[in-house]
């Protein structure tokens, strides 16, 4: 019991990070800008134009205004007094929030780096890939029976997010600045335009706050999981495990000291796996329905009693994995039964053995993907290709390059699909949409345009993935064709593309 209590006690000896002076450093904003260029660029090449507005001159002007304290009046109610944000309010606010997100990430990065070094993990780049979750599911989920699909609740009050960072960052000035950003978009956590504006314009800060909030409750869950399971967490522990908890965990210490062993007996499960993606998580187990209901009540009580988050039991669904598909990151994944028959013979007697095993299957959901294409104006809601009117002012090569880029990214991201027919249909829609866009630009019909220039004009970017496989296996074209039909998971995909993100 003393070991458990030491684990849950608050340790603040390594949390004295004073980050506010970094707000006035120019290189912080340069780092934030480079991160935005490399990571958050849209697959559709359509952005808000922030890249064009960034310059060191604007950064110097921004820092000069912040040094003038009489101009730094953080009042969102009186527009006459708010001279700091009156001119270029959106640009300055976005630049400060992005720079602030880079600064607040420093304590988390230091903690993660020390954790990786202590556990002897030199490189963790592959763990960042979105596709790394699918080989894990392919290896584990086929042996499990039940799965909890959990819709993670979000804080209903902004101060909860501030309190989450309070024990990571011992800097009152930084926390006050964080409160200003949150209250400037006071309704960011509600489904309205203000919330959408905050999450889109301040993605890095938004994801940092959200992930730090998730880290709080997952750290407790992983602690319980490690104590109640014979299997120790490895990679997930590296990324999520944390020993710093805030004050209300002291109440949990008393509870665990009194009834810790009883609680663990109720949640005992030697085969249990947990995966989180976006705002959902999956808890897969080989246990019984009774055990899964116990975990459901545990999550609901943990959120409501210790994190003050209201969550109804209906947000957690118990499903049998072999007859239910999981909507995960643009894929429909399931562990379907794969029947097989084995013929055996013993002396003069022959017999047949029916054997059915669970096989992990991942397919591309065609209907949501067509909906994303229709929203992006590549087709209508029925999937009929249309021209992209906003691109008709571009040159022919630029139009083909943009369509080709989208098609290659979709092929790259959905390479793990076990059924390629849906992906071929998406390629056909993009190909015909590209032809219609070019024909509209030249005021011609698609048939006349392709007849004049040749149908091979649009072939190059639809066969890019096959060409890569042929270069990889030059002596065995049949092997490369079989490989192309199989699932391929890439470990260099660190962001989900816009069209696959139907959520």
From Swiss-Prot:
RNA-binding as UniProt keyword: yes
The protein's role, per its UniProt record: Usually encoded in the trnK tRNA gene intron. Probably assists in splicing its own and other chloroplast group II introns.
Subcellular compartments: Plastid, Chloroplast
GO terms classed as biological process: mRNA processing; RNA splicing; tRNA processing
Gene: matK
Family listed: Belongs to the intron maturase 2 family. MatK subfamily.
Protein name: Maturase K
Signal peptide range: none
Lineage: Eukaryota, Viridiplantae, Streptophyta, Embryophyta, Tracheophyta
Source organism superkingdom: Eukaryota
One MF annotation (Gene Ontology) recorded for this entry: RNA binding
A GO CC annotation given for this chain: chloroplast
Keywords on record: Chloroplast, mRNA processing, Plastid, RNA-binding, tRNA processing
One Pfam family matching this protein: MatK_N
